[in-house]
């Protein structure tokens, strides 16, 4: 059973402004972005990688943030910061103005035959995209402090076919926005011939229930 980490209603790559005027132009404000990043370790401060989409070159982001010793490499975060030189693809030192842990999971080692009612609870899908080895989901789910079943589960028969299993607790009430990152590394290493994955989802938003992601 899983307890989701909620991050509120931050919009991915939402443009915000800082309060730093430049000497040359007091009207100028540097644009900040909010992106999903991957914690890779510590070098004086926490270091993160950012991949925008698909197989874009990672931007290595160095910060002065001191992380809890229990945080492991691969944990995903939603980070707001001003990009290096205003370029999101550039590596260098950044100063996060917010940093929120995001639910991060591997593909399940069970198969979908274990979940005959895999689509019992709907997922209001807002967006889904692959960034490197991560499949990212931004969605609305009914809020509850009770554990729920949420997993990306492979088909028992069809290679490259996965199911987003969601079974919400009975006391779930109002909807809340969540980001979820699934690490595909292990699954793809076991299925190296794939050129795409197909994800089935009980999507209560646009009724697009099968999503295809090229690899």
Which sequence ranges carry the predicted segments?
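First exposed extracellular module after export/assembly in secreted or surface-exposed proteins
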Residues: 29-215
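Bacterial signal peptide processing site
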Residues: 20-23
């Amino acid at each position: 059973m899983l307890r989701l980490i909620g991050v509120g209603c931050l919009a991915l790559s939402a443009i915000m402004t800082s309060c730093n005027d430049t000497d040359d132009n007091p009207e100028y404000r540097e644009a900040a972005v909010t992106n999903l990043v991957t914690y890779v370790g510590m070098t004086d401060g926490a270091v993160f990688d950012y991949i925008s989409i698909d197989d874009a070159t990672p931007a290595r982001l160095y910060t002065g943030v001191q992380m809890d010793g229990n945080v492991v490499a691969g944990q995903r975060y939603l980070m707001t910061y001003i990009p290096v030189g205003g370029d999101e693809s550039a590596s260098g030192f950044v100063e996060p103005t917010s940093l929120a842990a995001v639910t991060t999971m591997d593909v399940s080692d069970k198969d979908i035959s274990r979940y005959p009612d895999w689509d019992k609870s709907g997922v209001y899908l807002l967006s889904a995209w692959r960034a490197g080895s991560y499949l990212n989901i931004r969605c609305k789910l009914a809020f509850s402090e009770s554990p729920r079943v949420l997993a990306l589960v492979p088909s028992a028969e069809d290679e490259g076919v996965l199911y987003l299993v969601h079974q919400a607790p009975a006391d779930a009430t109002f909807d809340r926005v969540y980001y979820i990152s699934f690490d595909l590394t292990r699954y793809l290493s076991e299925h190296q011939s794939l050129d795409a994955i197909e994800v089935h989802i009980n999507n209560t938003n646009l009724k697009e229930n099968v999503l295809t992601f090229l690899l």
